[in-house]
């Protein structure tokens, strides 16, 4: 894959700075997908962009789509893959409708995926934030959860409904612990996918569940600036579509 990236960069007649930007974005893409290109790995990559500003997301997706086309055009892929973006006001409006989240609490054998879904929908956490969440950051007595990101801390109230689901996950270093290490993005994606499919909601991606959290906060009367702060965002710019 490294050689393919180099060949792709050489085919682009762009400045040195642009070459560096392409290289950085594509190396990051390969790291997240582990060099495996499939519809599932592309979804995992797209979920990893959730924390970025819209402009950065657009740039990275453009670079990856150009690279994917290059691979297909040079017979390095047997089909053309493409990262999909939401297009048109109608599809945006559809995505912003409130859903019945009580389905997340129904009994399920997919307990790990269930807790991941609950943390996203009720606390607005991203899969990457959940992956780094340690047991010490959870205080069930005071019903709070502390998230550390980029040197900043934010303390979130843990809904009492989530406490029973958290209790069995606090014995290791991480809430989702792999012998003292964190699991991969692919693991979180797979666990969430298993769970939402089991409750008949295969379209409830991490992004959609996070949107449900935002919509709930709006219904409770909070401003976009307040919600941005709760989500750990520096500005509310990426939340403009919720106005």
From Swiss-Prot:
Predominant location: cytoplasm
Coiled-coil features, chain-numbered ranges: none
Active-site residues from the entry: 149, 210
Location(s), subcellular: Cytoplasm
GO cellular component: cytoplasm
Keyword Cytoplasm: yes
Domain Tyr recombinase residues, every copy: 91-243
InterPro entries named among the record's database cross-references: CB, DNA_brk_join_enz, Integrase-like_cat_sf, Integrase_catalytic, Integrase_recombinase_N, Tyrosine_recombinase_XerD-like
GO biological process, one term: DNA transposition
Tagged with keyword Cytoplasm: yes
A GO term, aspect molecular function: DNA binding
Residues covered by the Core-binding (CB) domain: 1-72
Record key words, sorted: Cytoplasm, DNA integration, DNA recombination, DNA-binding
Lineage top rank: taxon: Bacteria
Matching Pfam families: Phage_integrase
Family the entry assigns: Belongs to the 'phage' integrase family. XerD-like subfamily.
Function according to Swiss-Prot or TrEMBL: Putative tyrosine recombinase. Not involved in the cutting and rejoining of the recombining DNA molecules on dif(SL) site.
Protein name: Tyrosine recombinase XerD-like
Organism the protein comes from: Streptococcus suis (strain 05ZYH33)
């Amino acid at each position: 894959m490294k050689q393919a990236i180099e060949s792709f960069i050489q085919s682009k007649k762009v400045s040195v700075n642009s070459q560096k930007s392409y290289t950085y974005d594509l190396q990051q893409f390969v790291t997240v997908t582990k060099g495996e290109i499939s519809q599932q790995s592309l979804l995992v990559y797209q979920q990893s962009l959730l924390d970025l500003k819209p402009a950065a997301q657009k740039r990275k997706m453009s670079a990856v789509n150009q690279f994917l086309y290059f691979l297909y055009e040079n017979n390095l892929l047997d089909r053309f893959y493409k990262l999909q973006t939401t297009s048109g006001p109608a599809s945006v409006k559809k995505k912003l409708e409130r859903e019945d989240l009580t389905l997340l609490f129904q009994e399920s054998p997919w307990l790990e995926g269930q807790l991941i879904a609950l943390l996203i929908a009720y606390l607005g956490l991203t899969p990457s934030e959940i992956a780094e969440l340690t047991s010490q950051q959870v205080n069930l007595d005071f019903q709070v959860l502390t998230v550390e990101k980029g040197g900043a801390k934010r303390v979130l109230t843990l809904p009492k409904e989530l406490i029973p689901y958290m209790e069995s996950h606090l014995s290791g270093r991480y809430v989702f612990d792999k012998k003292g290490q964190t699991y991969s993005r692919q693991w979180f994606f797979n666990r969430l996918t298993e769970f939402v499919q089991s409750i008949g909601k295969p379209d409830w991606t991490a992004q959609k569940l996070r949107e449900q959290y935002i919509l709930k906060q709006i219904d409770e009367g909070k401003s976009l600036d307040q919600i941005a702060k709760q989500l750990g965002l520096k500005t509310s710019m990426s939340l403009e579509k919720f106005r």
